Amino acid sequence: MSITAERKSALIKEYATVEGDTGSPEVQVAILTERINNLTEHFKDHKKDNHSRRGLLTMVSSRRSLLDYLKKKDEGRYSKLISSLGIRR
C-alpha cells in the first residue's frame, strides 16, 4: 500500500530540479500522486475501508494545493508536470 524507498528515490531523481531536491512542488506532487494511485488500487478490493479513504481525500487536497501554488508561481512547470504525471486539470 505504501511506496518503497527505491520507488520514492526514483521519483525524487526524476522530478528534482537540482541534486538532492526533495522539497520542490514537483517532487512532492509526484510522490503524492504515486501514493494516491496505490490507494486507488487498494479501494478496488476494499470498498468499505473508510479510514483509508479519508487519508486519500487528504492527500488529494494536499496535492491540489501544491498544484495551485505551482500554477501561480510558474505555469510552464505546472503544465509540464501535469502532462508527465497524467493528471487531469
From Swiss-Prot:
Signal peptide: none annotated. GO terms for biological process: translation. GO terms for molecular function: rRNA binding; structural constituent of ribosome. Transmembrane segments: none annotated. Keywords: Ribonucleoprotein, Ribosomal protein, RNA-binding, rRNA-binding. Gene3D superfamilies: 6.10.250.3130, S15/NS1, RNA-binding. One of the primary rRNA binding proteins, it binds directly to 16S rRNA where it helps nucleate assembly of the platform of the 30S subunit by binding and bridging several RNA helices of the 16S rRNA. PANTHER family: RIBOSOMAL PROTEIN S15, BACTERIAL AND ORGANELLAR (PTHR23321), SMALL RIBOSOMAL SUBUNIT PROTEIN US15M (PTHR23321:SF26). Part of the 30S ribosomal subunit. Forms a bridge to the 50S subunit in the 70S ribosome, contacting the 23S rRNA. HAMAP family: Ribosomal_uS15_B. This is Small ribosomal subunit protein uS15.
